[in-house]
Swiss-Prot record:
Consists of a catalytic RNA component (M1 or rnpB) and a protein subunit. It comes from the Bacteria. Belongs to the RnpA family. The lineage of its organism: Bacteria, Pseudomonadati, Pseudomonadota, Gammaproteobacteria, Pseudomonadales. It holds the Pfam family Ribonuclease_P. PANTHER family: RIBONUCLEASE P PROTEIN COMPONENT. GO terms for biological process: tRNA 5'-leader removal. It is an enzyme of class 3 (hydrolase). It comes from Pseudomonas putida (strain ATCC 700007 / DSM 6899 / JCM 31910 / BCRC 17059 / LMG 24140 / F1). Gene3D superfamilies: 3.30.230.10. This is Ribonuclease P protein component.
Length: 134
């Protein structure tokens, strides 16, 4: 079972990590006032990076609240997202949304991201072989 912490190893820390996700995302999930970009990372756990600029959310209090909610939602749903580097980009108007609505919205976005992942080729091939033999 994946631990539900948000330790240093589960964060995107360097500009190189962010650039890799921005340059070649394997998954994009647009949402209400935000965009989630994802890329396979080859690890057994997901990593999260947040981009919340002053232009999109003016007040520091609101930016900090959003970051806290995003991290918490990621922490609770990370078993769905194993092996992904994820960047959340905030857009204008995100700061005005209330906490319960944001939690619900993030839950839906994580599920959409998990569904949009490409299935591993090994699993697809082995399933095809089994069905042909039967």
């Amino acid at each position: 079972m994946v631990s539900q912490d948000f330790s240093r190893e589960k964060r995107l820390l360097t500009p190189r990590h962010f650039k890799a996700v921005f340059d070649s995302p394997t998954g994009k999930v647009p949402g209400k006032n935000l965009l989630i970009l994802a890329r396979e990372n080859g690890l057994d756990h997901p990593r999260l990076g947040l981009v919340i600029g002053k232009k999109s959310v003016k007040l520091a209090v609101q930016r900090n609240r959003l970051k806290r909610l995003m991290r918490d939602s990621f922490r609770l749903n990370q078993q769905l997202l194993a092996g992904l580097d994820i960047v959340i980009v905030a857009r204008k108007g995100l700061g005005e949304i209330e906490n319960p609505e944001l939690h619900q919205h993030f839950g839906k976005l994580w599920k959409r991201l998990a569904r949009s992942r490409p299935t591993p080729a090994v699993t697809a091939n082995s399933a095809g072989v089994d069905s042909q033999d039967a």
